[in-house]
Amino acid sequence: MGCLLQAYAAQAGKLSIVIDDVGYRPHEENAVLQMPTAISVAVLPNAPHARLMATRAHSQGREVLIHMPMAPLSKQPLERDTLQPAMSSDEIQRIIRNAVNNVPYAVGMNNHMGSAMTSSLPGMQKVMQALESYRLYFLDSMTIGNSQALRASQGTGVKVIKRKVFLDDTQNEADIRVQFNRAVQLARRNGSAIAIGHPHPSTVRVLQQMLPTLPADITLVRPSDLLNEPQVDTSRPGSAQPPVTQPRNPFSGVKNCKPKRPLEPVHATRFFTVISESVSQSTLVQYFQHQWQGWGKKPFPATGD
């Protein structure tokens, strides 16, 4: 019987759930700490209650991650000390060192936003070098499909795992239930899955309702329990291409000038009048007129001495 139970446990799908953005709203985040301790928290290092919430979570035996702000491709307000691809290794080391000090007991890191940073291979190589010195794993939130995190970890001792499902892209409870069930199905099909959510009241309510009814073949685990699960590198070599910018004054050819007023129609009488005036004023007609009037004749011979 014991062997059967061990075999069943080995075949069970493993589901890991991480709650991001912790450290700003303790009154809401405390509800997360009432859930099973396998639910992990990712704490923003510069949040006002970062140290408090990390300490509370750790005291429960809960896994703590640093939720590191990283630069996105889109323009939006950024957290202080957001990692940028162009930063030097020393600057990235400094920021990560401060984050480790601000989030005690952290055993891993995941990215807050970060589509620009995680798609930069040189940038992520600097991050992995820093993480290796603190023996932290990296949970790739996969905010962009071409993340270079797994590729950047090659040659280091840093383990990389990947998010499969976002629970609460919307705060609609029905949508969150759909995403939770999707995470369960992926864990069952692939052997494991990581879902990321946020401490919204709607997310907390759905988890409170659905965790007690988790299927028997699904086991709730910490992210670090999945570090030896096989990971597929879906990235493309190189970093994300910068957006194409248009020149300030692109030449688009000469534009036709629009008449200020529509052209007036020309009637037949006016047409012949204009023709008559033009003919009468022509040089040839005036010449014949002058000849007819005698201006072109020779003068009479003089009669006197």
Language model feature labels by segment:
Residues R25-E29, H49-M53, L73-P77, M117-P122, ...:
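Extracytoplasmic/secreted cell-surface and envelope-processing proteins
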Residues T55-Y105:
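Substrate-binding cleft of extracellular glycoside hydrolase catalytic domains
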Residues A10-Q76:
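Active-site beta->alpha N-cap acidic-glycine motif
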Residues S133-T143, S202-G304:
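C-terminal domain-boundary segment and adjacent tail
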